[in-house]
Amino acid sequence: MTVYFTDRDLGKRFPEILRAGGLTVERHGDHFAHDTPDDAWLEEVGNRGWIALTHDRRIRYKPNERDAVIRHGVPLLVVVGAAPFQDLAEAFVTTLPRVEEFLAGHKPPFIAKVYRPTPGETAKDRNAPGRVELWYPR
């Protein structure tokens, strides 16, 4: 069973929407203190074989966090977008088939970005999926 772990920066509503969409989700706050360093939770997520979700676009540039992703074999998906978390979560659920296809084709460790569909795509199809792009390693 695929388990998604949501970083604290995605709040409480994001994982609720994913759960309502049928995903198995573990929240940061259910396992760690608010001030737990990212490299510590990344280690645990990697050890458990979970898929990590974050909104932190800078994580790739933080050596200790990037190294934790690599060292602990973490599949990390960065949810990209300056939108309310509800919109980001709904777009993630809509994009899930592409996320699953990406996960099936890429062996951890990696960092990938998950994008919402463009406004033009959603104007044509309200349920248009977004896209997933490998970010690290290149």
Segments (PLM) and residue ranges:
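Catalytic phosphate/metal-binding cores of nucleic-acid and nucleotide-processing enzymes, i.e., regions
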Residues: 2, 20, 24-27, 47-48, ...
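N-terminal first-folded block
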Residues: 5-48
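Small/polar loops that bind or transfer phosphate-bearing groups
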Residues: 6, 54, 80
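Short, acidic/turn-prone active-site loops that include or flank metal/cofactor-
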Residues: 28-35, 57-58, 80-84
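A polyampholytic, Gly/Pro-enriched intrinsically disordered region
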Residues: 49-52, 96-107
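Mid-chain, well-packed structural core segment of small domains
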Residues: 60-98
